[in-house]
Amino acid sequence: MVWSTNIKHEGLKSWIDEVAKLTTPKDIRLCDGSDTEYDELCTLMESTGTMIRLNPEFHPNCFLVRSSADDVARVEQFTFICTSTEAEAGPTNNWRDPQEMRRELHQLFRGCMQGRTLYIVPFCMGPLDSPFSIVGVELTDSPYVVCSMKIMTRMGDDVLRSLGTSGKFLKCLHSVGKPLSPGEADVSWPCNPKSMRIVHFQDDSSVMSFGSGYGGNALLGKKCVALRLASYMAKSQGWLAEHMLIIGITNPEGKKKYFSASFPSACGKTNLAMLMPKLPGWKIECIGDDIAWIRPGRDGRLYAVNPEYGFFGVAPGTSERTNPNALATCRSNSIFTNVALTADGDVWWEGLTEQPPEPLTDWLGKPWKPGGSPAAHPNSRFTAPLRQCPSLDPEWNSPQGVPLDAIIFGGRRSETIPLVYEALSWEHGVTIGAGMSSTTTAAIVGQLGKLRHDPFAMLPFCGYNMAYYFQHWLSFAENRSLKLPKIFGVNWFRKNNQGEFLWPGFSENLRVLEWIFQRTDGLEDIAERTPIGYLPNIQKFNLNGLNLDLQTVQELFSVDAEGWLAEVENIGEYLKIFGSDCPQQITDELLRIKSELKEK
């Protein structure tokens, strides 16, 4: 076979042979990552009805893809962590015995690529020449995955060359799980919802994914490698793999700092990563909007890289008002999945414009009528190259990463949590991360206003016992040679009694970043100590031009003692799921906050 002559790595070659014997594809193709290959595969998908080319006047070299209605999101119930013991996976993960799961998957994968091409996709998470980076090889029968991996990762010949004859790589096997009999016509989005499995084996750092063609389940470099496998590796190797954005922020005097920030989904991570400042002289630049790998540098500071090469952004709600940089980023060379299509070949989703254009074809390919179900799926996406972001930071591809001055944790909370507060210590900061939660919306979970705990925004992505993960974070404070960043909590989503947001949000969030910037510079008089952390001194916080009334300001920046006592109680109750594995330092911090609040 031609593919094998181009692979010098015997271990890789024998694995591909083994997979081919199991899955029985009709062809095998080694992907080189070239633009020519990308164009060829897009043309192939146009011919099968998988892709629709958009009007090049609006979106040059862009495509719309419609998935099956039952393959539209990550599937937590079919996502498994396989470790030698169940305790190692912890109470927040679905655990399966590795040997049992391998036998089960072996049966599922047997003959699953019949009638399809097996694509060999060498990819690198992180800059190729970086000590941070991890190389993987994904074997997949989905051309959609190949094209998406070209956008989302460094992929192709350069990665294969870097492996040489014996370099380490992670084995990532994926199939849509729909073999084709001779003469059987394919469907535009093959998948196998009844047999979906997204499985992570921590004993050999491998992933096997079956039955889904959707993003996080099928682009195995993203959540599977960059978070679930990487977080497990990071624990033993002394670093962190986090669900975080990374931004550079420059003040009017030209001083620059880097922040990372962790938010659960639907809390504005991409909007903050691409924020366009309204305050004169300030600049925000984006390194990444979703994943950060963080390692101690030689100088003792923590350095972060974005292991990804593209954005996989949620489309609904993205507009010229909320995120003009995101719209500019996905204007060309992008793939849109499950958005609506206009009559003149453009894309549309809820929130893009105030009024929907008519006529519209919805994400299922049917004529759309106003007042019915959404035209674009709520989890519809754009996949766009990182380098197209207008506010891309010059250090976006730095092999060493960028030094962090602040780590920010946030959630969607309508009450109690102030606009911004600073942890009193690293241990307190870890407690803020462990206690993160968001108020769900009816669209997400049926019950409006229910609190959903999501520690460090890593609940779906931590590849091992979360209590051990908390302990790993705490261990950084034990290393006296480290110069750790300050930790902050933020909440853009406080509401008044009428249910209206107290804070304007979006570009005005720069005012919060300005205060954080000043605190990392050591300005003491702009903050006041409280039981829950350092809160802004209202007189020293930049509210100029916002026209907020005094009551609103007080609600945004005050400590609601009663609310916080309930909050501490709620966090403590949640952490009971970890039993005696929950670190004592976190319990001690919660007790400290409780006793100080009662003394007030």
Swiss-Prot record:
Cofactor(s) required, per the database record: Mn(2+)
Residues in the signal sequence: none
CC terms in the record's Gene Ontology section: cytosol
Main localization category: cytoplasm
Cross-referenced Gene3D superfamilies: 3.90.228.20, Phosphoenolpyruvate Carboxykinase, domain 1 (3.40.449.10), Phosphoenolpyruvate Carboxykinase, domain 2 (2.170.8.10)
Domain of life: Bacteria
UniProt xrefs under PROSITE patterns: PEPCK_GTP (PS00505)
Annotated catalysed reactions: oxaloacetate + GTP = phosphoenolpyruvate + GDP + CO2
Top-level enzyme category: lyase
Cofactor binding: number and manner: Binds 1 Mn(2+) ion per subunit.
Active site per database record: 267
Subunit and interaction comment: Monomer.
Family (UniProt): Belongs to the phosphoenolpyruvate carboxykinase [GTP] family.
Function: Catalyzes the conversion of oxaloacetate (OAA) to phosphoenolpyruvate (PEP), the rate-limiting step in the metabolic pathway that produces glucose from lactate and other precursors derived from the citric acid cycle.
Protein known as: Phosphoenolpyruvate carboxykinase [GTP]
Organism: Chlamydia pneumoniae
